[in-house]
Amino acid sequence: MSLTIDVKILDNRLHHMLPSYATPGSAGLDLRACTEHTQTLAPGETIMIPTGMAIHLADPHYAALILPRSGLGHKHGIVLGNLVGLIDSDYQGQLLVSCWNRGKESFILNPLERIAQLVIVPVMQANFNIVDDFQASERGTGGFGSTGRQ
């Protein structure tokens, strides 16, 4: 299944490096740091990084998620400051990435470095039906480890 999304390039350097899927099975498109200069993220610091692009999904049955890149988080402690970025279908502004250095060492971020990934997901909007009680289930109200570890 394929979806066509309107993309506005805000940084001319991206014209030759648009996000693309690395493999046929890839779910995420890499987003790049469209900064003018190298930036240093000190331990514990969070900064907003422009991606140089805007998208408009237009269809309320879709949303985009900005997620961390696994290598940056595991090897360098660079994750998203908001953990997940949710891009609503009607948002048209530049995609920004909140980068947080949860590591113990400073991290050097170079211009056009891949910093996060964008995943397009289907969305179902819910209507609420108010009830006095739920039909009983096997789990009931058990949570937070109630099903065990093994």
UniProtKB/Swiss-Prot annotation:
Reactions the enzyme catalyzes: dUTP + H2O = dUMP + diphosphate + H(+)
Keyword annotations: Hydrolase, Magnesium, Metal-binding, Nucleotide metabolism
Organism, as annotated: Methylobacillus flagellatus (strain ATCC 51484 / DSM 6875 / VKM B-1610 / KT)
CDD domains: trimeric_dUTPase
Example GO biological process: dUMP biosynthetic process
Cited Gene3D superfamilies: 2.70.40.10
Coiled-coil residue spans: none
UniProt family annotation: Belongs to the dUTPase family.
Binding locations of substrate: R69, S70, G71, N82, L86, I87, D88
UniProt-listed Enzyme Commission number(s): 3.6.1.23
Cited Pfam families: dUTPase
Encoding gene, per UniProt annotation: dut
InterPro entries: dUTPase, dUTPase-like, dUTPase-like_sf, dUTPase_trimeric
GO MF, one annotated term: dUTP diphosphatase activity
Annotated pathway: Pyrimidine metabolism; dUMP biosynthesis; dUMP from dCTP (dUTP route): step 2/2
Cofactor(s) named in the record: Mg(2+)
SUPFAM superfamilies membership: dUTPase-like
Class of the enzyme per the UniProt entry, highest EC level: hydrolase
Highest taxon in the source lineage: Bacteria
Cystine connections: none
Protein name as annotated: Deoxyuridine 5'-triphosphate nucleotidohydrolase
NCBIfam families in the record: dut, PRK00601.1
Purpose of the protein: This enzyme is involved in nucleotide metabolism: it produces dUMP, the immediate precursor of thymidine nucleotides and it decreases the intracellular concentration of dUTP so that uracil cannot be incorporated into DNA.
